[in-house]
Amino acid sequence: MVLLHPLLTAAALLGASARAQSVVGTPFGFASGTTGGGNAAPAAPKDTNELKEWLADPNPRVIVIDKEFNFIGTEDTCTDCECCIPDSNTCGDAGQNAIKTEGSDWCGSYPATTCTYDNAGLEGMEVASDKTIIGVGDAGVIRGKGLRLVNGVSNIIIQNVHITELNPQYIWGGDAISLDGTDKIWVDHVKVSLVGRQMFVTGYESSGGVTVSNSEFDGQTKWSASCDGHHYWSVLGYGKGDQITFANNYIHHTSGRSPKIEFDSHWHAYNNFWENNSGHAFDVGEGANVLIEGNVFSNVKTPMNPEDTPGSTFAVNAQDASSCTSALGRPCIANELTSSGELSGNDEAVLSGWPKGEGDTKAMTTDKVPSYVKANAGVGKLGSGGSGAASSSASITPSPTSSAIPSSSATPSSSAYARRHYARHHHY
């Protein structure tokens, strides 16, 4: 009998897993028809440089995230750089100061201060068209850098990946997943935690054909803009003409913008579970059209921000559930609220102009939502057939560099470039 070294055996098994990795489930909602890298041979990049290269190249790819890719320190550190103290930070080190981004006057007259942050987090990795990015089990982690889908890219699947630790101490520290001018994007079974700014954001250019599903937005943080251990900057939709299906997601320990939606867009939010939100969930701005059905809100202080909601919202209750039949081909499901504030919005005009491109959507009743979502949303829960198994995902804790910054610091020119480049694309 030949005995193999345990490390060699583990490496062989992981390699076989990478080769066998494929997307679980089928894109639905506005992202129906998305194929990502299609039949390209699955392959796992060897390091952060190769991951960046593969994401940005023009070839269809199935990119397997079979381990943690840690970008912290890979683009140097900005030491004692310009920052400010916003009015929201009334709790010192437990709050969030803001990075002063060149080209933006966000800091305005706020008191100036200095801060030290990692440059890699400021700008996400650019992802080209026809890509599938898929994690193995709960091992697929991208630490310290997000994903950026812009300039007309299309046909991209992101599944079973945990994105974490993008300068969580600082506003403008980095976005996990950002879209700006895209089409046919499926974000599924993703987890986001410990970010400086947005967990998921669409920029000003239209992002049509997008579905965000079965994902976990974990707002637990030591650096809170609301000074209560909850992350404020969560989900933001700013694209003119966005069409987004937002389904089966778990949004917890946030305090605002969960989501904030603006401009001429259509969002269909159903079968999501909001839990332990100390501020507001929905914030619907002018021009937005939002259909909210079959969701559960538990311990959410303000499910709908009434002070800043001039957009069109139809939040379904039991009395008007049948109104959806003409638009969706089925009755809507009423929302459920427990230990939460009021979910306002009864504008049935949202339905009259509903886009036909979303196709059939199947919603479960709210009594099933909390257990289903908590068992299936996030990483390590793909299971079979896309339904997911009730397994726990890997816990991510900040690396030592979150508080103990690496010794190498960026030159003034490289730090300034990073701040300018970030500000040019991030005014929201």
From Swiss-Prot:
Signal peptide residue numbers: 1-20
Region (Disordered), start-end ranges: 337-367, 383-428
Catalytic activity: Eliminative cleavage of (1->4)-alpha-D-galacturonan methyl ester to give oligosaccharides with 4-deoxy-6-O-methyl-alpha-D-galact-4-enuronosyl groups at their non-reducing ends
Domain of life of the organism encoding this protein: Eukaryota
EC annotation from Swiss-Prot or TrEMBL: 4.2.2.10
Compositional bias segments (type: Low complexity): 389-417
A Pfam family hit: Pectate_lyase_4
PANTHER family the record matches: PECTATE LYASE 18-RELATED (PTHR31683), PECTIN LYASE F-RELATED (PTHR31683:SF67)
Name of the molecule in the record: Probable pectin lyase F
